[in-house]
């Protein structure tokens, strides 16, 4: 092969790499679920920022679906350019509606709920196996915490003792009535979608998660992890988000 041909080949490779880089979405917004706050995303945040992404973490009030959508929308309004929207657990219901925001180019569900239009969160569990280790204690005011004694096994069985204790003690209670609020329009009908499903999740039946992800047309990654997959398998979660960022603009529905 001549030097000129090698030079042209090198230029083509460089052009292809530059084109791929231009199509990679930089903005990522992370949305936590119930019984948690945004601090649990720290390991995913660190990995994504190291890959050059601009990451913003929503702090949901967990007072209603509408309030959580509003909190997420405020963050999306701040993004400059296309954005990958990521939700864990209840955060999946939030991104299903908030994902209709024009800035959102792709969705990533991390062991997350994905209701269809007109459905609420509570109905997603119908017909699937119960999760006896996921125990919610509901107060007189209608807000629920995860039970202190069963938290580790139900939410973070594969986390070390320190991380499990931190997650337990950093809980944010959710207004249980939020689970009865239906989604108006499921954004996954219109946006390319990815899903990470934790196969050892004691909070959700994996069959339920798979059903929702397949219905949404998601590209699914299975990983051996608890419901705290965002913390215990941060490498896998961040890589799926990065792949979504690379591909969302070229796989738009």
Which functions belong to the PLM regions below?
Residues 26, 188-193, 215-218:
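Short, proline-enriched alpha-helix->beta-strand connector loops that line the catalytic pocket
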Residues 21-81:
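Active-site catalytic motif of lipid deacylating hydrolases and related acyltransferases
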Residues 195-197:
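Short beta-strand/loop motif that positions the catalytic acidic residue
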Residues 100-148, 175-182, 204-205, 212:
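Flexible "cap/lid" loop of the alpha/beta hydrolase fold
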Residues 143-187:
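Conserved alpha/beta-hydrolase catalytic His-Asp/Glu region
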Residues 86-91, 95:
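Gly/Ala-rich beta-loop-alpha elbow adjacent to hydrolase catalytic centers
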Residues 78-81, 244, 248:
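Glycine-rich phosphate-binding loop signature in dinucleotide/nucleotide-binding domains
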Residues 199-231, 243-244:
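Conserved loop-alpha-helix segment in the C-terminal half of the alpha/beta-hydrolase fold
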């Amino acid at each position: 092969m001549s030097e000129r041909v090698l030079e042209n080949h090198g230029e083509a490779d460089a052009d292809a790499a530059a084109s791929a880089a231009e199509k990679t979405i930089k903005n990522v917004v992370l949305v936590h679920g119930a019984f948690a706050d945004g601090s649990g995303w720290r390991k995913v945040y660190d990995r994504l920022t190291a890959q050059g992404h601009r990451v913003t973490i929503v702090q949901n009030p967990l007072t209603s679906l509408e309030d959580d959508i509003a909190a997420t929308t405020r963050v999306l309004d701040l993004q400059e350019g296309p954005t990958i929207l990521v939700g864990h657990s209840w955060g999946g219901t939030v991104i299903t509606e908030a994902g209709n925001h024009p800035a959102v180019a792709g969705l990533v569900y991390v062991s997350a709920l994905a209701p269809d239009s007109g459905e609420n969160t509570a109905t997603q569990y119908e017909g699937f196996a119960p999760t006896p280790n996921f125990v919610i204690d509901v107060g007189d005011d209608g807000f629920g915490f995860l039970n202190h004694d069963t938290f580790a096994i139900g939410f973070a069985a594969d986390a070390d003792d320190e991380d499990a204790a931190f997650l337990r003690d950093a809980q944010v209670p959710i207004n249980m009535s939020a689970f009865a609020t239906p989604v108006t329009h499921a954004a996954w009908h219109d946006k390319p979608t990815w899903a990470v499903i934790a196969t050892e999740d004691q909070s959700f039946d994996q069959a339920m998660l798979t059903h929702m992800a397949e219905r949404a047309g998601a590209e699914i990654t299975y990983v051996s992890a608890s419901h705290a997959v965002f913390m215990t398998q941060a490498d896998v979660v961040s890589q799926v988000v990065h792949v979504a960022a690379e591909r969302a603009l070229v796989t738009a529905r």
